Amino acid sequence: MGKGSEGRSAAREMTAEANGDKRKTILIEGVLYDATNFKHPGGSIINFLTEGEAGVDATQAYREFHQRSGKADKYLKSLPKLDASKVESRFSAKEQARRDAMTRDYAAFREELVAEGYFDPSIPHMIYRVVEIVALFALSFWLMSKASPTSLVLGVVMNGIAQGRCGWVMHEMGHGSFTGVIWLDDRMCEFFYGVGCGMSGHYWKNQHSKHHAAPNRLEHDVDLNTLPLVAFNERVVRKVKPGSLLALWLRVQAYLFAPVSCLLIGLGWTLYLHPRYMLRTKRHMEFVWIFARYIGWFSLMGALGYSPGTSVGMYLCSFGLGCIYIFLQFAVSHTHLPVTNPEDQLHWLEYAADHTVNISTKSWLVTWWMSNLNFQIEHHLFPTAPQFRFKEISPRVEALFKRHNLPYYDLPYTSAVSTTFANLYSVGHSVGADTKKQD
């Protein structure tokens, strides 16, 4: 582990195939593999690390994404090996030495954490997370069963929070850091996201892995592909026509993001993107969980005496609140930070340091509210580590960053939220700015 060096890339070679396609190579722990004909079980994310012709060093990404997999190394060993002497650095000797030092330090630190048990799941923590969600849903429906308008409103709000908490625990399961058993975490992810949020856990995992592979990297991080509903960076709106309906929408996106855009994004996911993916990939069990969600909701609302129309309205309100809860918390960790060019290759540590921020890590309330993902830097460094352990390792991560002159941001929650909305406003008003400068 850690034998590879971030930044090294494979020399470009032509395949022996008659069609003349470029060979796709990938470098892991100093070994160069031919991945041209390899169908990655985890989807197209592997293309980020082969980049068509020149494979980049994927050691850190490979180990973090496959830490709990018993099959990954078997797949890797089955790939044809190429002459590693053709591997050359795209950086100067000084820059490559800096990156190699980070790689060695990071690998040694990670091995320490594994040996000390920081990657081990906790059964009491698992029980707490599940019981909390069940209790929140039960309380929400109990409140909605009361005749008081105040109880009804509180019940809808509580239900939205419960759906958001389902999103948090699904996120943990999707990373394989809940039970630590990949197949079990995957099935639980599908159940909690399907019943709790009405969405596909498998689709989410497919997309979210791309975000982790290259956060805030244009044409790689799917979290930047948010048009037409919202835009988080000026570079993604350069092709928006000034004066168009989209341009007008973006000018007010800072005001619409929470009350309108979050709901529209959620509805787009649950009614179109996720079902389309589930149909294409034949994720039949996920349809079962989502149908169970709808049947359960409307049956229960009917039993409580609510009309179909009122039941739909209450569903949309609670669903929308859940979307606001989740989407806003994810937005504050990345969206206001700089982006990198498609061709840029950052070190694994640099992605976490420069394109991620921690938020109020000393606050127990924020830690609960964000379900330990206010330690976003640690999460991006170690995506398969149980998230409740990040608080314990954060001082050591900060020390690691200090040794390599990397920033370690920890913003107050209120500052992170205000910065996020200020960025939405700035990006929305940047449409056409390049044209005006040219004039």
Swiss-Prot record:
It comes from the Eukaryota. The gene is Fad5. It catalyses: an (8Z,11Z,14Z)-icosatrienoyl-containing glycerolipid + 2 Fe(II)-[cytochrome b5] + O2 + 2 H(+) = (5Z,8Z,11Z,14Z)-eicosatetraenoyl-containing glycerolipid + 2 Fe(III)-[cytochrome b5] + 2 H2O; an (8Z,11Z,14Z,17Z)-eicosatetraenoyl-containing glycerolipid + 2 Fe(II)-[cytochrome b5] + O2 + 2 H(+) = a (5Z,8Z,11Z,14Z,17Z)-eicosapentaenoyl-containing glycerolipid + 2 Fe(III)-[cytochrome b5] + 2 H2O. It is a multi-pass membrane protein. This is Acyl-lipid (8-3)-desaturase. Belongs to the fatty acid desaturase type 1 family. It is found in: Membrane. GO terms for cellular component: membrane. The cytochrome b5 heme-binding domain acts as the direct electron donor to the active site of the desaturase, and does not require an external cytochrome. Its cofactor is Fe(2+). Residues 7-88 form the Cytochrome b5 heme-binding domain. Heme binds at H40, H66. A motif (Histidine box-2) lies at residues 208-213. It comes from Thraustochytrium sp.
